[in-house]
Amino acid sequence: MNIRPLHDRVIVKRLEVESTSAGGIVLTGSAAEKSTRGEVLAVGNGRILENGTVRPLDVKVGDVVIFNEGYGVKKEKIDGQEVLILSEMDLMAVVD
């Protein structure tokens, strides 16, 4: 299935991180802290400004981003894979 976000929305696949406890035990699943880094899978056309022009997004497909998993983030399953649909405003940084 293809998915195309609208306007300033971005589709992100969460990147898994390996968490280790203070005692050296590798934590997985619900015991591990969820990553706030992800890979951009798709981007919308851009934010519509008050004057009607469209400002392109600052991120592109393939970028690794740090995001804020707040109120506006929507979790979806696409082809059996969990993805996040969020606004560009929920992105905090691009990791180079």
Curated annotation (Swiss-Prot):
InterPro entries: Chaperonin_GroES (IPR020818), Chaperonin_GroES_sf (IPR037124), Chaprnonin_Cpn10_CS (IPR018369), GroES-like_sf (IPR011032). SMART domains: Cpn10 (SM00883). The keyword Transferase does not apply. GO terms for molecular function: ATP binding; metal ion binding; protein folding chaperone; protein-folding chaperone binding; unfolded protein binding. It is found in: Cytoplasm. Keywords: Chaperone, Cytoplasm. The keyword Nuclease does not apply. One of its GO terms (cellular component) is cytoplasm. NCBIfam families: PRK00364.1-1, PRK00364.1-2, PRK00364.2-2. Together with the chaperonin GroEL, plays an essential role in assisting protein folding. The GroEL-GroES system forms a nano-cage that allows encapsulation of the non-native substrate proteins and provides a physical environment optimized to promote and accelerate protein folding. GroES binds to the apical surface of the GroEL ring, thereby capping the opening of the GroEL channel. Belongs to the GroES chaperonin family. PANTHER family: 10 KDA HEAT SHOCK PROTEIN (PTHR10772), CO-CHAPERONIN GROES (PTHR10772:SF58). Heptamer of 7 subunits arranged in a ring. Interacts with the chaperonin GroEL. HAMAP family: CH10. This is Co-chaperonin GroES.
